[in-house]
Each structure stands twice: as C-alpha cells, then as structure tokens.
Amino acid sequence: MKNTKYNLASDSWGEEEIFAINDVIKSNQFTMGPKVKKFEEEFADYFKSDYAIMVNSGSSANLLMIASLFYSNDYDLKKGDEVIVPAVSWSTTYYPVNQYGLKLVFVDIDRNTLNIDPKEVIKAINQKTKLIFAVNLLGNPSDLEDLKSICKKNEIILIEDNCESLGAKYHDRYTGTCGLMGSFSFFFSHHMQTM
C-alpha cells in the first residue's frame, strides 16, 4: 500500500501575492501599516459597517470584543454575569468569556442548523444574563432575527463569532454585523485565508 501524504495547508500564491508580500517586507512595517488600514476600510465598506479592526486572529478578536464590553462605561458587564453560548463551538469562543470572570451558560443547538437554539436561549435567561454570544457555524447563520428580538426584549447584548461564516448572509445582512459586534477570521482552516 502506497503512503500518500496530504499537506494540512498549502499556498496558492501567484506573482501578485508574492509582490505584495515583498512590498510589506521591504517597508519594514509588518503591522498597522497603510496596507492594513486600507484593508480595514475596504472590509468595513464591504460589510456595510462603521468600523473594522484587524488583529492577529479570530481568537484575539473574540477576546477584544469581551474586553471592550467589560471595560466600557456604556455596558454594565462585570465578573459573575452570565453569557449564553451555544453548546457547539470552539474554545476560542468560550475562553475569553471565562478569562474575564463571566459565567458561561451553555444552551443546546437546533439540530437542523447546528447553531444556538433561540427557544433554549429563552429558557436560560435570568437576572444575571447580560450577553448572548451567537456563533454562525460553518457558513450557516444563526437565527439572528429571533436572537435580536430576545435581546431587545430582555435588554441583553448580542455579539457574533462569525469566524466560520465570512460572507454568509442572514436575510439582507452579512452575518457578523447583526449584533453589537462580530468577529471574523482568515485562519488557514477557514474558507478564506490571508497572510
């Protein structure tokens, strides 16, 4: 039997990408340079958002979303408050919540979508619930209309982990733009990657 090896990841770079990489290397500005600023502006425009802030990973983006809510004077988020999350996701959704001393409340998913089930969310809400962290899994949008309605009725914040669903739409809006904030990722295991 022949041993066949498959690369976990491989590049598909052409001349244009190689020149772009060389331009960045020659500039000696590997972060926060003009190319990043341009990418942020074009990304925000494409998704019809006011802002886009690029960081090193979707994991860091999730952490920054939680941190910005935790340290903001506009939101009353403190240690011990509860965050409703889907039972199916990645550690990178859960760890930032835990890192800030917030309590994870896992709710079951809808078997048809693999996303958080709004009916289960309603059952989990109590006085300590401050946030719903929806995850749009594998290009499949959560029921964002129901989640937004639940959040509005209960004065709860909705944020989205959209790392697996870049470019997906829910009705006429891109996923990741339906809550207060959304995270995106270009990690190599996702359907669109960057370097």
Where are these regions (language model features)?
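Hydrophobic residues in well-ordered beta-strands that form the structural core
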Residues: 85, 106, 158-160
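Conserved donor-binding loops in enzymes that form glycosidic bonds
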Residues: 10, 87, 137
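Hydrophobic, well-ordered secondary-structure scaffolds
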Residues: 1-3, 85, 97, 111-121
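Phosphate-binding glycine-rich loop
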Residues: 29, 33-82, 96-100, 106-108, ...
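N-terminal "arm"/small-domain region of PLP-dependent enzymes with the aminotransferase-like
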Residues: 1-29, 34
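Active-site phosphate-binding strand-loop segment of PLP-dependent enzymes
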Residues: 112-194
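Conserved coil-to-alpha-helix start sites within the AMP-binding
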Residues: 88-94
